[in-house]
């Protein structure tokens, strides 16, 4: 394991140990980070632009309150389906090291979007592929390909309701009913269908958790709040520049990836053109036959034209046969560098970025914690973050008195901000902060 990866895991453990992140619910999502440089790296799918692009992925795990505490930085050759089990395993290991009980570890609830919809992934999380059949986690996910059957359900079946209490937006009441569906390559799966809004839009939710383990109301609450993670990623993107990388270093790949043989693609295109020509000629024969029956064309002329067309079809069929033989001789996949005149794909070294992202996520979490303290003295919830920024970015004087370092903020004209700033300083002073150098001088904050 590289140093950056180890640092990320150790910080994740400390988030759990110090109560900054809460164990129990883990939302997992990925963010595509595009790369516009000159190096040849693998491509991924840009969800916003809907095109393949060179880039990498940041996979983030957050708790029920959307506190980011575990994340991975990976090349775009690794997707969310592969990373969900890895993040779960890392999270459980760090949970054990942080002192979480084994019962709580095994009852971890994992929530992800439709991108994680996969029978193979569901079976892996259920433990179907493990020798000991041990479940990895309780998963909750939106179902795919359910648009048709959910709208065929009778309105009367939606006889239960749950109120979703969001962090900022107004609460919403949803109707739902519980059933069971058969999923290809997985089998029977617990399903909850919800109906929302005036338009009565319907969506299906899949989970492997039993009724005893997790109630339907909680399942609906958890997955409907999943947008909180999307908002978190946007905040990390725009306020903390999570897409930034402090330089790019590359590493050679152990093996060049195998790609579809372009010669086969070229031959298949050529074969398709020939088959289209054959079909057009067959249509021409049918048209001639109709024209002859209607008396528009003599039988002799039709037969002469038909003989000529059939000869052309025979030639084209022979060409198609030769192309098929050529395709069979060629390998289906070839190495990337063999196709691109020796140019090789490389992978980016993410060590600097991992270290920097650890700092950024730590700063984000500390800002959230300070907002919690500030909210005791500043009651405008929607303005709490701007108020905090006004305080922490305020000009200050530093004064050393004896062995105490005083940080003195200039007072604020706004009385509400001034009041909140003074009490925030008191909260910080109660934590007994000190300088991180060898002197360990006590720090005292005040507003004057």
Enumerate the language-model features and the residues they cover.
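Active-site-proximal, Lys/Arg-enriched surface segment
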Residues: 1-62
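C-terminal, active-site-flanking charged/polar segments
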Residues: 223-259, 313, 317-323, 327
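An anionic, glycine-rich sequence signature occurring as long contiguous blocks
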Residues: 128-229, 237, 402-409, 414-423, ...
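Domain-level cores of phosphate- or acyl-group-handling catalytic modules
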Residues: 78-148
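Electropositive, glycine- and tryptophan-enriched low-complexity nucleic-acid-binding patches
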Residues: 46-101, 201-204
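A short, flexible helix-boundary coil/loop motif
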Residues: 167-172, 262-448
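Short, well-ordered loop/turn and helix-capping segments at boundaries between secondary-structure elements
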Residues: 145, 211, 225, 229, ...
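Short, conserved catalytic/metal-binding motifs centered on acidic residues
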Residues: 1, 22-33, 66, 107-117, ...
């Amino acid at each position: 394991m590289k140093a950056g990866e180890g640092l990320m895991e150790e910080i994740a453990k400390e988030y759990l140990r110090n109560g900054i992140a809460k164990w129990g619910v883990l939302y997992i999502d990925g963010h595509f980070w595009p790369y516009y440089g000159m190096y040849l790296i693998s491509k991924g799918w840009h969800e916003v632009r809907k095109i393949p692009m060179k880039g990498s992925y940041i996979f983030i795990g957050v708790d029920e309150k959307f506190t980011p505490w575990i994340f991975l930085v990976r090349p775009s050759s690794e997707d969310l389906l592969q990373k969900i089990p890895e993040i779960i395993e890392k999270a459980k290991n760090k949970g054990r090291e942080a002192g979480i009980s084994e019962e709580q570890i095994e009852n971890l609830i994992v929530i992800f979007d439709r991108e994680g919809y996969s029978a193979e992934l569901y079976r892996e999380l259920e433990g179907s592929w493990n020798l000991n059949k041990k479940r990895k986690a309780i998963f909750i996910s939106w179902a795919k390909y359910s648009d048709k059957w959910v709208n065929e359900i009778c309105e009367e079946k939606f006889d239960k309701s749950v109120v979703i209490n969001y962090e900022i937006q107004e609460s919403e009441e949803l109707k739902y009913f519980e059933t069971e569906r058969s999923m290809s390559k997985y089998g029977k799966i617990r399903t909850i269908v919800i109906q929302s809004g005036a338009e009565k839009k319907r969506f299906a939710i899949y989970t492997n958790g039993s009724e005893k383990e997790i109630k339907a109301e909680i399942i609906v609450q958890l997955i409907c709040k999943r947008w909180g993670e999307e908002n978190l990623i946007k905040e990390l993107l725009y306020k903390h520049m999570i897409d930034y990388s402090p330089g790019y270093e590359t590493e050679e790949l152990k093996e060049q990836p195998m790609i579809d043989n372009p010669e086969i693609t070229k031959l298949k295109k050529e074969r398709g053109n020939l088959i289209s020509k054959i079909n057009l000629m067959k249509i021409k024969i049918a048209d001639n036959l109709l024209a002859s029956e209607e008396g528009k064309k003599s039988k002799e002329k039709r037969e002469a034209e038909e003989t000529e067309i059939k000869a052309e079809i025979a030639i084209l069929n022979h060409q198609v046969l030769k192309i098929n033989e050529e395709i069979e001789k060629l390998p289906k996949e070839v190495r990337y560098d063999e196709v691109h005149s020796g140019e090789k794909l490389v992978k980016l070294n993410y060590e600097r970025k991992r270290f920097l992202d650890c700092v950024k996520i730590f700063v984000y979490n500390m800002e959230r914690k300070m907002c919690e303290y500030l909210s005791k003295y500043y009651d405008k919830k929607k303005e709490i973050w701007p108020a905090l920024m006004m305080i922490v970015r305020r000009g200050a004087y530093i004064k050393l008195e004896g062995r105490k370092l005083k940080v003195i903020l200039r007072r604020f004209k706004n009385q509400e901000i001034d009041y909140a700033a003074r009490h925030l300083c008191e909260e910080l002073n109660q934590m007994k902060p000190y300088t991180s150098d060898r002197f360990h001088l006590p720090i005292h904050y005040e507003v004057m």
